[in-house]
């Protein structure tokens, strides 16, 4: 939702207008923002049963006569793309933001493997947030540069890489936000704060993050870990923090809509994910000038500035050492650098 809304806020809505389709029970849809910008919203039944979902979506797409549909559901996009094809939507974009998961998510990986060819079959255009996400979904041939060897008819099937864009001004560092957030969360201004923002799930690997922070505390007692988000693993991670005896040094904020303020309060950003496409939180954190530690499962394209490192998911001690070395080394001009990098034409 966040990536799509970033584009929607910035786009010329007199030229292009969005309608949003989401599942019944979706929790993070910014309804008021969409209404204020002239967008319409349609609530869909869940995929189960799939025929009901397909009939409902096909009817709505037919009635509204869209020029373009843009799907962000990874391999599960095969169903809405099929509905769009049947409804006569001429341009159907499959936009991938992810790769495959770890061993704990074998059932999800199997589903992705089975659905992937059908998602590609029903799309007319391929998008991805990074080369890693593109290669996983579309294969090496689709991500290769265009050349005369390729059939001109198939050129539209090449992948368009669309990095997850953000409002750089919003995420620039603010001393005022830093003081305010620390006061709100009752964190001393002198503390070293390590931050993490993400859904609590196997992909984000928060269990390993807790192990990293235990090692950090052995060397720097005044450290605090802020973990922001919700998800199916949240209670499991809370229990792990309690079992480690560090609950007085860890702050769970729940879901927040002010990530820009949180980044200013952090001294270092940690993202030890098991897999990623191009994490927008990593872009935001670098824009705020933070030194960031990402796992090497994250695409190298996430290293936008010189303040991000990719580390293997090995020993928590290695991560702790790297985090302590870079904590507090903030680049307060990073927002301007990120803006320049994002807007500079490719060679």
Model-derived features: where do they sit?
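Conserved small/polar residues in nucleotide/adenosyl-binding loops
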Residues: 342-347
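Short His-centered aromatic/hydrophobic patch
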Residues: 71-77, 95-96
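Aromatic "clamp/platform" in nucleotide-sugar-dependent glycosyltransferases that forms part
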Residues: 255, 274
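A conserved mid-protein helix/loop that constitutes part of the nucleotide-sugar donor-binding site
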Residues: 1-6, 192-215, 232-238
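A short helix/loop element that forms part of the nucleotide-sugar donor recognition site in Leloir-type
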Residues: 142-150, 172-187
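N-terminal strand-loop element at the rim of the active site
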Residues: 2-52, 145-152, 232-233
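Carbohydrate-associated surface elements
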Residues: 132, 165
């Amino acid at each position: 939702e966040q990536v799509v809304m970033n584009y929607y806020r910035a786009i010329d809505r007199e030229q292009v207008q969005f309608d949003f389709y989401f599942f019944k029970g979706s929790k993070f849809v910014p309804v008021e923002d969409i209404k204020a910008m002239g967008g319409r919203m349609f609530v869909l039944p869940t995929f189960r049963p799939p025929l009901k979902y397909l009939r409902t979506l096909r009817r709505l797409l037919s009635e509204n006569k869209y020029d373009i549909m843009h799907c962000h559901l990874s391999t599960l996009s095969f169903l809405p793309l099929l509905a769009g094809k049947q409804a006569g939507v001429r341009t159907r974009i499959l936009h991938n933001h992810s790769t495959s998961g770890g061993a704990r998510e074998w059932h999800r990986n199997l589903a992705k493997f089975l659905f992937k060819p059908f998602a590609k079959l029903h799309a007319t255009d391929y998008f991805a947030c990074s080369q890693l996400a593109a290669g996983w979904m579309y294969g090496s041939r689709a991500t290769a540069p265009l050349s005369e060897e390729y059939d001109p008819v198939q050129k539209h099937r090449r992948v368009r890489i669309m990095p997850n864009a953000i409002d750089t001004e919003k995420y620039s560092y603010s001393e005022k936000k830093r003081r305010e957030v620390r006061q709100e969360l009752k964190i001393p201004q002198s503390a070293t704060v390590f931050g993490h923002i993400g859904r609590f799930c196997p992909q984000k690997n928060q269990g390993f993050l807790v192990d990293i922070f235990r090692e950090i505390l052995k060397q720097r007692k005044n450290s605090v870990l802020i973990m922001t988000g919700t998800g199916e693993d949240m209670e499991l991670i809370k229990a792990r923090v309690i079992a480690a005896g560090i609950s007085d040094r860890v702050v769970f904020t729940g879901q927040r809509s002010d990530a820009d303020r949180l980044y200013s309060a952090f001294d270092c950003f940690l993202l030890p994910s098991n897999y990623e496409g191009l994490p927008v939180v990593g872009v935001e954190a670098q824009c705020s000038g933070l030194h960031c530690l990402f796992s090497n499962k994250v695409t190298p394209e996430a290293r936008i500035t010189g303040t991000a490192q990719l580390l293997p998911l090995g020993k928590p001690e290695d991560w702790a050492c790297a985090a302590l070395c870079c904590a507090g080394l903030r680049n307060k001009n990073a927002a301007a650098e990120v803006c320049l990098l994002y807007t500079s034409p490719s060679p």
